[in-house]
């Protein structure tokens, strides 16, 4: 359970990073 939670947390963090990158490129 803990490992699964860590994996989903990492996945969410990565998804947020990609989204922020896309937004930053859109703004430029």
Swiss-Prot record:
Annotated keywords: Bacterial flagellum, Periplasm
Q: Name one GO cellular component term.
A: periplasmic flagellum
Location(s), subcellular: Periplasmic flagellum; Periplasm
Assembly and binders: The flagellum consists of an outer layer composed of repeating units of FlaA around a core that contains several antigenically related polypeptides.
Q: Which family does it belong to?
A: Belongs to the bacterial flagellin family.
What this protein is reported to do is described as: Component of the core of the flagella.
Report what the protein is called. Answer: Flagellar filament 34 kDa core protein
Q: Which organism is it from?
A: Treponema phagedenis
């Amino acid at each position: 359970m803990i490992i699964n939670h860590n994996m989903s947390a990492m996945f969410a963090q990565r998804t947020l990073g990609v989204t922020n990158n896309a937004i930053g490129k859109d703004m430029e």
